[in-house]
Each structure stands twice: as structure tokens, then as C-alpha cells.
Amino acid sequence: MSTPTPLSYKDAGVDIDAGNALVNNIKSAVKRTHRPEVMGNLGGFGALCELPTKYKHPVLVSGTDGVGTKLRLAIDYKKHDTVGIDLVAMCVNDLIVQGAEPLFFLDYYATGKLDVDTATSVVNGIGEGCFQSGCALIGGETAEMPGMYEGEDYDLAGFCVGVVEKADIIDGTKVSAGDALIALASSGPHSNGYSLIRKVLEVSKADPQQDLNGKQLIEHLLEPTKIYVKSVLKLIEESDVHAMAHITGGGFWENIPRVLPANAKAVIDGASWQWPVVFDWLKTNGNISQHEMYRTFNCGVGMIIALPADKVDAALSLLEAAGEQAWLIGSIASREGEEEQVEIV
């Protein structure tokens, strides 16, 4: 009887050496995001972080999200360096809705076969997103799972924790009729609606590399999600923000009501901004109704902010000075009975 061939973890499809090489590659990206509250170094069993001392009654705010099927396009077109920014943006933009300053971020990268260069590119993007939002990339997990994912396909998840002063939590309770609504421009579809986007590409048989207003269509579609943290936190510090809505999955119809009292509705002037060309392309080539566009996509608006009408001019000036494209998009009105909480006129 012959002796069985000795087996290793690598024979089963898991390369520990590749994982170690990845950790070594991303050290500089992690170091760039360091905050003084972070204790210890990368690689511990748990990541430690103190609360900033400036808070008298700190409340932790947490969030988790992914990039969705935008990853399919990124993988197909070998554009891995910006999906990490998307991942961070989807989490930190949720946290600032409640007035929280992002503290730290963790990522989960799962793949069938670990390609060190691809994973390094992705995590460097995560580091860039953390740098833009001022939060520390404090840890993560890389899972090589042969048989669970096809080849070098991968999926991402992100987890973020922030902090806000208890007295300064923004929860929508101050919203009242007469408040103004300010919109912050998105950079494109951000990270939502990509299953429909891919369906439009399939049905229309469009070439993703075709020119669209001086840029390839695929470049419009893979534009990273805008991170609003620094500009919005500055606005919160200097103005009286009553509520904010991060326009993600569910678009206008689903996200705005999440931050409104039951007796309030948002009345939005649909002509107050111009849709970016990529949304017009999707609407036309997918024969998508106006209602479905607003239900699926951000249509050029990544964040909506409710604040007193007399604060609008100062808020717009501050946001534009911070690098945002911002405009007055509508107002809050009283809601009668079972009226819809979002009206686009």
C-alpha cells in the first residue's frame, strides 16, 4: 500500500503566504489613517481605540455596508483601486447623518483565490477612503475560500464606528414646516442600483467603453462614491442642521422619510438641479420611468440636508468653500393624513 501524498492548506486552495504578503503590502495605507486614539498596531486579535477626550457624553454610532454588484463591473474591467473608497463612503456617509464623527473602520475581503496585487489595490482604496473621512483603518479580515467564490472574484463588507455628543445627535425631531432642503451633488450612481445598471447594459447591448460626454461610460459607472464627512461635519459645527438623508438604495422615496417626523413631508423641485449625463443615459437606454429612477438612483443628489430657511445662504457658502456642489432643492411642508412623505414637483 502506497503512502498517501502529504497535503497542505495550500493544496486545498488557501495560501497563507499570500495572506502575509498582503498584510505587509497594506501597512503604509493603514499607517496613513492613524488617529491618536488608536492603541496598538495592525495584526492583534482585537483592535483598540480610546474615545476622543473632547466629548462630555459620547455616544457610539455604528454602521455596516458593502459595494453591491458594482464589484462585478470593477472585476470585469479590472478597476480595483476605487471600490475601497466606495466601501468606506457607504458606511461613513451613513454615520454623519446622525452627526457622528467616524472613528475607526474595519473591512472584510472574501475571495475564492487571493490575488495579492488585486487585494492590495482594493485595501489601498479603503485606506484612501478612511483618510478622506478622517477615520482609522484599524483592522480587517481577508478570507480565501475556494469553492465559495468563482476564481479571483471577491466581495467586500465594511464596518465603521463613530462618536457624537449625546446632546448633538441629529435625529430629525427638530424638523418642521418651513425648513429648507439643501442637496449635495453626487459623483455618479455611487454604489446603488448596479443590478439595474448591469441589466440596462445587457438589454441595450451598449459598449461600456463608448464615449459619454468626453469620458467612457464605464468610467462614469465606476466613479467612486463621494465622501461628505469633512464638509458636513463643518456645516454641523457652524449651522443648525435638523436632519440629513444619505440617498442610497431606495433613492428619494425610501431614504428621505427615514429622517422625517410623521407630520412632515419633503417637497422637492425636480427642476432645481440637472441630472448628471450618466443618469439620462440610463433612463433612455433602459426605458426607465421617472418614478423608478428616483426610487433606484440618487439622480445626482448624494445627501439632502434640512435646516432653517434663514441658514440657507450661509450653509451654501460654507459647503461650496469646502468643495461641495450644493443647491437649494426644496422645503419641508406639513403632511396631511396618509400623504406621501416625498413630493417631487
Curated annotation (Swiss-Prot):
Q: Its principal location?
A: cytoplasm
Q: Gene encoding this chain?
A: purM
Q: What is its EC number?
A: 6.3.3.1
| This protein's record includes keyword Cell membrane | no
- One GO cellular component from the entry? cytosol
List GO BP terms, alphabetically.
'de novo' IMP biosynthetic process; adenine biosynthetic process
Q: Which UniProt keywords apply?
A: ATP-binding, Cytoplasm, Ligase, Nucleotide-binding, Purine biosynthesis
Q: Which Pfam families match?
A: AIRS, AIRS_C
**Gene3D superfamilies reported for this sequence:** PurM-like C-terminal domain, PurM-like, N-terminal domain
Instruction: Give the family, as the similarity comment puts it.
Output: Belongs to the AIR synthase family.
Give the pathway annotation: Purine metabolism; IMP biosynthesis via de novo pathway; 5-amino-1-(5-phospho-D-ribosyl)imidazole from N(2)-formyl-N(1)-(5-phospho-D-ribosyl)glycinamide: step 2/2
Gene Ontology molecular function? ATP binding; phosphoribosylamine-glycine ligase activity; phosphoribosylformylglycinamidine cyclo-ligase activity
The record's section on InterPro entries has:
PurM-like_C_dom, PurM-like_C_sf, PurM-like_N, PurM-like_N_sf, PurM_cligase
Q: Can you say where in the cell this protein is located?
A: Cytoplasm
Instruction: Write down what this protein is called.
Output: Phosphoribosylformylglycinamidine cyclo-ligase
Annotated HAMAP family: AIRS (MF_00741)
Name the catalysed reactions: 2-formamido-N(1)-(5-O-phospho-beta-D-ribosyl)acetamidine + ATP = 5-amino-1-(5-phospho-beta-D-ribosyl)imidazole + ADP + phosphate + H(+)
